[in-house]
From Swiss-Prot:
It holds the Pfam family DUF4731. The keyword Nucleus does not apply. The gene is smim1. Belongs to the SMIM1 family. It is found in: Cell membrane. Keywords: Cell membrane, Disulfide bond, Membrane, Signal-anchor, Transmembrane, Transmembrane helix. Its main location: membrane. This is Small integral membrane protein 1. GO terms for cellular component: plasma membrane. The chain crosses the membrane at residues 41-61. Disruption phenotype: Mild reduction in the number of red blood cells. InterPro entries: SMIM1.
């Protein structure tokens, strides 16, 4: 069975000497993933975006409720 380009090499006399080599494109993708989806700035951005969405939903509900329950 072939894996997706990763190769495992081991020394048959020592099971502690195992190395895993990833293809270069995979390590680039991991670097991009780590830069885009992790980190303090990204977490703060996600929190700010979710708070903004909640405020917009609250305002939309308030306006909708105002016009639905308006006596007149």
């Amino acid at each position: 069975m072939e894996s997706n380009g990763a190769s495992v090499q081991y020394n048959r006399w020592s099971e502690d000497n195992i190395t895993l080599q990833e293809p270069q494109s995979r390590s680039r993708l991991l670097g991009i993933y780590n830069r885009v989806f992790t980190g303090r700035l990204v977490i703060m951005f996600k929190i700010a975006a979710s708070l903004t969405v909640m405020v917009v939903m609250y305002i939309a509900g308030y306006i909708t409720g105002f016009y639905v329950h308006q006596c007149g």
